[in-house]
C-alpha cells in the first residue's frame, strides 16, 4: 500500500493598499458617452494585485482534490431578489488574466450572465474582478433588464470580455437578439478604469439571424483587429473586424471524437497555438446535457480532434450534476485554469473552478469558495505552488497528497 504524506506547511496572506482610482480618458474622447450602469459599492481598489506570501499558519487539514468542483464560485446577480432566491446562478463565464501587474487593481477580470432558474430575463452581462479567482470585487458592470424583453425571443446573452492593449481599455461584448424580426447583434461597452463604462454601441448586427448570428463569440484582439470565432448552425465560424469593416465568413474545421455538435466555445492563443474549449451535444434536440471538449490548431481554422475533458458528475443533487455549458479557460505560469458552467435538472446553475498542467488532467478542490473564500484561496494557491513542482500526475492522489513510496 502506498503511503500519502501531507506536504502543505505554509499559508497565504493578502496585502493591499487603498488608493484613489484616477479615471483618465484618451485625448479627444467624448466624455458624455460614459455612464455608470450599476451603483458601485466602493471606489477603493488595490494599488497592486494581491500577491500570495508564505506563512506558517495555514491549515490544510481536510483539503482534497475532486474531479469536478463541489462549490460554485461566488458570482452574483445584481438583482438582489433573484440572488436571494437563486444564489450564485451565474452562467457563460469569460476570464481574462491581465498579468502580475494587473489592470486597475486586479489581475483577473471575469464576465458572466446570471441565469436564475433558467430565466433569460436576467441573462444580462455582468463583470467582476479578482486577484485570486475565488474572492471577487463588487459588480463592476451590469446591464439592466431589457425594456423590450420577450421570453425566449428578445433577450441578452453570451457575454465576452476583451482587453484592447492599444487603448488600454477593457471591452465587454454581448449578444442581443430579437427572433420576431430575425435580428441579431453584438453590442459593446468599454471602460478605462473598470468602474465607469460607455453606453452600448453596435459592434455587429444582421437582419438575417438564422444565417449570420454569432452565438458564443470567442474574441482575440490583435493589433487593431478583432479576431472573432463563433457558432452558427452547430459549426464554428470565423470573421475579422478591422477599421469598421467585417471580413467574409470562413468555416473552421473541428472534428469530435464522438461526432458531437458544437454549441458554445471559448478560445485562447497560447504558445503560438490556438486552443478551443467547447461544450457540445450528441443530440441537437438536447443542449442541456452536454460535456466539455478541447482541441488545438496551428492557424485557428483547422483544429485537431476535440476530445472530452470534463463531464457532469451524474449526481442529480450536485449543481453540475446533469450538464455542462459554455466555459472559459486561461494558461498562466505552466498551469491551465478553467471556469466552467454547469447545471442540474432542478435548474440550479453555476460556475466552478478547475486547474491542471494540461487540459486532460483537470482537478477541482473540496474548498467552499462561497462561504470560506479567504481560507479557500490560501489553500488553493498553496497547493498550486506545490503542484507546479510535481514531475508527473502519478505523484498526486485524488486527495491532493504527494505519494511517498
For the regions a language model picked out, list residue spans one by one.
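Positively charged n-region of N-terminal signal peptides that target proteins for export
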Residues: 1-4
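Hydrophobic alpha-helical membrane-insertion segments, chiefly the h-region
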Residues: 14-23
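Hydrophobic alpha-helical membrane-embedded or membrane-associated segments
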Residues: 7, 11-15
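Carbohydrate-active catalytic/glycan-binding domains of CAZyme proteins
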Residues: 26-405
